[in-house]
Amino acid sequence: KGKAGSPYAITDYYDIDPDLAENVSMRMTEWESLIERTHKAGMKVIMDFVPNHVAREYHSIRKPAGVRDLGEDDDPNMHFSIKNNFYYTWGDLDLNDVRQSKPEFKAYSEKDAKIYEPYEESPAKATGNDRFDNRPGCNDWYETVKLNYGIDYCDAGGRSYHYEPVPSTWGKMTDILLYWASKGVDGFRCDMAEMVPTAFWSYATQILKSRFPEIVVIGEVYDPNQYRNYVKAGFDYLYDKVGM
């Protein structure tokens, strides 16, 4: 993934990757045309949905009018708040360990400082693979930040759950699912679904399926002990990549 990050570092949930378009300015029209052609051919469209984390530099430029961006109303002085979309750590983001172990980072910084654009966060957000300090390493998902679904991971007792009132992130992520379903998507492949609480999935799938009864929801879940819980939460299919 290197400096560019992985395709699972989402920069805008409401946009189409410009690299996939023939005409960048018409990328949404091209996407809608793709769905139409697929349906005419008798096939279905299953879209990737990455709910656990976003890019560190997430900023939606295509969100519908009136939609508040993720983190736009956050209080970064709060490590955890049910009103925040992200988790915040103490101190600035420190990627020194990544720079030292990733040659592409080192090459950029030493060769030409003008083209080297380091991630800057103050305070740093928690990293997508549940790292809650400000110094992710090269084996962490350092280019991503964890979304807050109402779980305080650093509570004195380990974890505490805060689902009432409904966390801000729940509403925003459900709206994203509804947006793409309204475009004609037939289902979603939910990346690392088990890193997101089943309480959210129950909330989101009930709303989604009440408006789009034929929608299919597929979850990436690795713990067999959790299969029943995720099926009860509204998933139609579960899978893992073990042995692939």
PLM region spans:
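Active-site-proximal helices and loops of the catalytic beta/alpha 8
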Residues: 35, 53, 62, 66-68, ...
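Substrate-binding/active-site clefts of carbohydrate-active enzymes
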Residues: 1-172, 176-179, 227
